[in-house]
Amino acid sequence: MILNSSTEDGIKRIQDDCPKAGRHSYIFVMIPTLYSIIFVVGIFGNSLVVIVIYFYMKLKTVASVFLLNLALADICFLLTLPLWAVYTAMEYRWPFGNYLCKIASASVSFNLYASVFLLTCLSIDRYLAIVHPMKSRLRRTMLVAKVTCVIIWLMAGLASLPAVIHRNVFFIENTNITVCAFHYESQNSTLPIGLGLTKNILGFMFPFLIILTSYTLIWKALKKAYEIQKNKPRNDDIFKIIMAIVLFFFFSWVPHQIFTFLDVLIQLGIIHDCKISDIVDTAMPITICIAYFNNCLNPLFYGFLGKKFKKYFLQLLKYIPPKAKSHSTLSTKMSTLSYRPSDNVSSSAKKPVQCFEVE
């Protein structure tokens, strides 16, 4: 818990009740190393995703619009990751000034909300494309997808404003270090619990319920399709993919959300024990690594569910340039079921194996 003290030279001086919380030598080595790995892998992977979707696949489908924006949001976050790596390696000493403190903090918050919102919209799009391919054709347009992405970026920007306003550089007098941190003027302030609940509910619980519902309905539709088409072999890979998507999202974010909530309780003074503060402050950067590393892999994960994406991705790795002209395909080509229970369309020759493709 941090207590307010005084202000000098434009930098607020504060006292830390638990100055040793989270300050371990292995954290100062392990976390910067993990950040560096996430930065290299994330920048490389997401840059390739952007190139493949924009230059090779020509951004023709709704799903590709969401994936492109997901990769761009990840890149924006990854560009600030070296700052956090240096910050942690210097034992939580912030050398970059107040403006970069705000920008880097806002980038972390922005990526959280933008990525979660985009994944939620992608799950809704998959549901509409698979379960209601005909009815949703007029709604699942490129214009709607692009407008949705603009709204998502604006919402993520608004959700990140508290980081811009309340994240600042502080000098901790009893440890003699300058940190980039949230600081609340009063323990009675409702702001920290409001921000914490917003992150828990808007940044995880509500999107997870939508994602879980969407893929559960897809699961049921696929099972019904297989029951009707008993003469066709069942492909359990689709069900494994659905399970992987839901569990991947859940276990990536649950640890971070739990420790975020505990951190709010510490900031409010509800938890006073320095041992608990040490556990939370030690675990927090580890949960960040788990959440954001998985987050940065999402564009590749979702992209590789499509055959065309894999084809173009391998072409790019082999330095094969995109074709100047590309024959367009209908947006509704991706992810239609051979049996369409909601649209009363008879079975076709297509198999439901392609239900998660993004081309």
UniProtKB/Swiss-Prot annotation:
Description of how the protein assembles with itself and partners: Interacts with MAS1. Interacts with ARRB1. Interacts with FLNA (via filamin repeat 21); increases PKA-mediated phosphorylation of FLNA.
One Gene Ontology biological process: calcium-mediated signaling
Physiological role: Receptor for angiotensin II, a vasoconstricting peptide, which acts as a key regulator of blood pressure and sodium retention by the kidney. The activated receptor in turn couples to G-alpha proteins G(q) (GNAQ, GNA11, GNA14 or GNA15) and thus activates phospholipase C and increases the cytosolic Ca(2+) concentrations, which in turn triggers cellular responses such as stimulation of protein kinase C.
Alphabetical list of PANTHER family matching this protein: CELL ADHESION MOLECULE, TYPE-1 ANGIOTENSIN II RECEPTOR A
Lipid anchor positions (S-palmitoyl cysteine): 355
Post-translational modification as stated in the protein's UniProt record: C-terminal Ser or Thr residues may be phosphorylated.
Topology in membrane: Multi-pass membrane protein
Keywords from the named record: Cell membrane, Disulfide bond, G-protein coupled receptor, Glycoprotein, Lipoprotein, Membrane, Palmitate, Phosphoprotein, Receptor, Transducer, Transmembrane, Transmembrane helix
CDD domains for this protein: 7tmA_AT1R (cd15192)
Stretches assigned to the Extracellular side: 1-25, 90-98, 166-190, 269-278
Biased composition (Polar residues): 337-349
Location in or out of the cell: Cell membrane
Tissues in which the UniProt entry reports expression: Expressed in liver, kidney, adrenal gland, heart and colon.
Species per Swiss-Prot/TrEMBL record: Cavia porcellus (Guinea pig)
Binding positions (angiotensin II): 15, 17, 167, 182-184, 199
Residue numbers spanned by region Disordered: 337-359
Disulfide feature: 18-274, 101-180
Residues bearing attached sugar chains per UniProt: 4, 176, 188
Keyword Nucleus: no
InterPro entries the record matches: ATII_AT1_rcpt, ATII_rcpt, CCR1-9-like, GPCR_Rhodpsn, GPCR_Rhodpsn_7TM
Keyword presence, Protein transport: no
Assigned protein family: Belongs to the G-protein coupled receptor 1 family.
Single GO molecular function: C-C chemokine receptor activity
Transmembrane annotation, as ranges: 26-55, 62-89, 99-125, 142-165, 191-216, 240-268, 279-304
Annotated Gene Ontology cellular component terms: external side of plasma membrane
Cytoplasmic side: 56-61, 126-141, 217-239, 305-359
Protein name: Type-1 angiotensin II receptor
